[in-house]
Curated annotation (Swiss-Prot):
One GO MF term: Wnt-protein binding
Pfam families for the chain: MBOAT
Protein name, UniProt field: Protein-serine O-palmitoleoyltransferase porcupine
Membrane topology designation: Multi-pass membrane protein
EC code: 2.3.1.250
Phylogenetic lineage: Eukaryota, Metazoa, Ecdysozoa, Arthropoda, Hexapoda
Disulfide bonds: none
Keywords recorded for this protein, A-Z: Acyltransferase, Endoplasmic reticulum, Membrane, Transferase, Transmembrane, Transmembrane helix, Wnt signaling pathway
Its job: Protein-serine O-palmitoleoyltransferase that acts as a key regulator of the Wnt signaling pathway by mediating the attachment of palmitoleate, a 16-carbon monounsaturated fatty acid (C16:1(9Z)), to Wnt proteins. Serine palmitoleoylation of WNT proteins is required for efficient binding to frizzled receptors.
Similarity comment text for this entry: Belongs to the membrane-bound acyltransferase family. Porcupine subfamily.
């Protein structure tokens, strides 16, 4: 349930000239579309992406140089991270620095106080949960006190990444005294300000951040030198490919969807499909840009195992989103997992697993939904959307589980192996194909319905408007998915 949050980032690239371009009349020719939309978007994308690539490549090179000259001076990593991260924030975010600063400083102060005074005591509430309560409370109060919604919209994603880092740090250092001993003001600052993910994410753990300094093991120096040229070319290819993918999704979101759907946009479901697809492709833009940023900052790009995949290193740190899994979903569970992979892992590791043992599965799922929603701030549309997604995910899982049991068929949420011995009807049978295709169509329908409420061109959501305008796209579609959800829930009890 780590969903729709990337409309926050659209303020980064939705400049006035681009916003005007996206609102152009749908009868523009291809030449006018290129002139009024593609060119402004390309100019901005070039400037914006260059900041990420240049600063992170500089960070990577400096880490390699300093690590070679001073192999034991790990504090150099933190200093470089602080300087490069601050430079990137200064280049791409022009408002709201004080929100970031006060949240980062206060979260460290809270953790330091709790570690100093509560360590070893028989406390009923663990330190990380106190940090969660404080961090989310600080985030919500800051949003309420910020007079400019536009300013908050520019830093919302950065604040969320900062909070996720600090909360994971609270969990990781709660019982790991060895890791806690490495946590100083300088190392904390370097982790929080790491240029690879300070602005757009993704979240990485404190341990993952520290491995930037460690040289790759298992590679002989001569072997490393002999193949370093090839590996460098692969590394550059990956960075360029990710950047081009990001630009492609940005142009698709800003320009091409409107142009291609213009002849048939009089039908409300086509308009809803266009809005939802524009939103999803804007998310893919952010995902591939953050992937590009992470790879540009990878000081250990020459690891031998990275050659197994030319598009992405083996490490899951670099895989942010999977458009194919989202656009062609077997189930909504697959969409939830593939939408934002690092955030899904964060919620699973630190919220769901931590609360499942003491409170049970049901409570753990509810708490995961609540934390996921609150991390995004006061975004009521998103809260309702996440609740709808969670409800659909549960109903789909239970219905398919019942159908698989009754008919002994491979129609579960997860795909059965080709040599499945549990079910009589295999995945390639006619019955299973029909059932799975019906759920595929249902999930495509839900992607349209749930995504159309977010428009990447609308800027920050105006949550003070009446519910009718807030959920206008759903009203236009007669709340079809919600009625279908009720029917599916009743069907679950009937079968």
């Amino acid at each position: 349930m780590d969903y729709y949050y990337d409309d926050y980032y659209d303020e980064y690239y939705d400049h006035p000239d681009q916003a005007a371009a996206r609102l152009f009349h749908r009868d523009l020719s291809i030449e006018e579309t290129i002139k009024n939309c593609v060119h402004p978007s390309l100019r901005f994308a070039t400037q914006y992406i260059t900041n990420f690539i240049a600063i992170n490549l500089l960070f990577s090179v400096l880490v390699l140089i300093v690590r070679k000259l001073f192999p034991t001076a790990q504090r150099s990593l933190h200093l470089l991270s602080c300087v490069c991260g601050a430079a990137l924030v200064y280049r791409v975010i022009d408002h709201g620095f004080y929100h970031f600063l006060q949240l980062a400083v206060s979260l460290y102060a809270v953790q330091w106080t709790l570690h100093r005074w509560l360590t070893g005591t028989g406390r009923y509430i663990k330190t990380p949960f106190i940090v969660i309560a404080y961090g989310i409370g600080n985030l919500l109060v800051s949003e309420l006190l910020e007079p400019s919604p536009e300013t908050w919209n520019r830093i919302r994603g950065t604040q969320m990444i900062l909070l996720m880092k600090a909360l994971s740090l609270a969990f990781d250092t709660d019982d790991n005294h060895s890791l806690r001993s490495q946590l100083t003001v300088l190392s904390y600052s370097g982790y929080i300000l790491c240029p690879a993910n300070i602005v757009l994410g993704p979240w990485i753990s404190f341990n993952d951040y520290l491995t930037i300094w460690k040289p790759p093991a298992g590679i002989e120096p001569k072997q490393c030198r002999s193949s370093s040229g090839r590996r460098m070319l692969i590394h550059v290819f990956r960075i360029v490919t990710s950047a081009l993918m990001a630009v492609g999704f940005l142009l698709t979101s800003n320009c091409m969807i409107d142009y291609l759907l213009a002849p048939i946009n009089s039908w409300k479901w086509v308009r809803a499909y266009g809005r939802a697809l524009s939103f999803r492709t804007s998310h893919y833009f952010i995902g591939y840009l953050s992937q590009c940023s992470m790879m540009a900052a990878a000081a250990d790009w020459h690891r031998a195992e990275d050659e197994r995949s030319i598009m992405l290193p083996v490490s899951s740190l670099y895989r942010i989103t999977s458009p194919m899994a989202v656009e062609f979903p077997r189930s909504l569970v697959q969409v939830v997992t593939a939408w934002n992979i690092p955030m899904h892992l964060w919620l699973k590791r630190y919220i769901f697993r931590t609360t499942k043992r003491p409170f049970g599965t049901g409570t753990a799922i509810a708490l995961t939904y609540i934390i996921s929603s609150l991390l995004h701030g006061l975004h009521y549309r998103l809260w309702i959307t996440l609740l709808t997604i969670g409800s659909w995910t549960f109903v789909e899982h239970e219905v398919r589980k019942k159908l698989a049991t009754i008919y002994s068929a491979c129609v579960l949420v997860g795909k059965c192996p080709s040599s499945c011995t549990v079910h009589q009807h295999k995945s390639n049978s006619v019955f299973c194909t029909v059932i799975n295709m019906l759920f595929f169509a249902l999930n495509i329908f839900n992607l349209i319905y749930l995504g159309c409420i977010f428009e990447s061109s609308e800027g920050p959501p105006d949550e003070v408007q009446q519910d009718k305008s807030m959920f206008g796209p759903w009203t236009e579609l007669n709340y079809a998915s919600h009625w279908l959800l009720v029917f599916a829930y009743l069907f679950y009890f009937v079968i």
